[in-house]
Amino acid sequence: VLPTPFDEQYDIDLGVMHEMVSRIVDNGLTFGKGVIKISSAVGEGPMLSDNEWPVLLKRAVDAASGNAPVMLGIHYKDTKRSIDDAKRAQDLGAVGLQIDLPFMHHSNQDDLVRFYSAISDQIEIGIMIYNTHWFCQNPVAEYLNADTMLRLKDAEHVTAIKWAVPDGEDYDTMKRFSDTFNVIDNSGQHVRCFKNGGVGYISSLIPVYPAHDLEVLDLLENGKYEEAKAKEDLVNEALAEWMTKSHAKSG
């Protein structure tokens, strides 16, 4: 996950974006080792205008120079506009899309199937579902559950889900579909996810120190779960005081 850099006038700083992408690619985040995700929630995606995110995506794709996959976050738009943005991102070189739940519509499970299937039918790149239950009015009723994920197996371009579940729901239900879809942990339970058949996790530390997460990923992929957890804990403990102060200043 990459943040979106801005200059002192709060305009996107494309030069810094280029440097950031080039740096993490040069430090080993390449095909098979991760995906560069821009315009996500951490990347201020919901706040970017329809004139801003395309130039940001183009710069990231250019900086990756074909050495790493780049995906784009699409946020809480209706089906038609999501399809329009998806096609535009595809033309600009994105290999995939992270697409939020349509939570502004208080969707039921049938709505979710229709929404993601409709987008899948119109594009040729992958879709990772962003299971944003914390934005839903009724998280348990409106998050995309395991039964619904299985209903999407025929949606050709739905390939992955960022997995997290509301309080009281069973995280381990991902085992029912982890042999069909790529499951990416989005709840800080990386070891649990990999034990359940998951293949990745989200990290906001990549822009700062790619080597750490590349090493953790290698350990997880090789079943060295205790070592992976120890490395994560070491870094998390070192950052804990700063994180507390940072969150106190701004959510």
Label each residue range with its predicted role.
Residues 30-32, 89, 220, 245-248:
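Short, charged/polar low-complexity linear motifs in solvent-exposed/disordered segments
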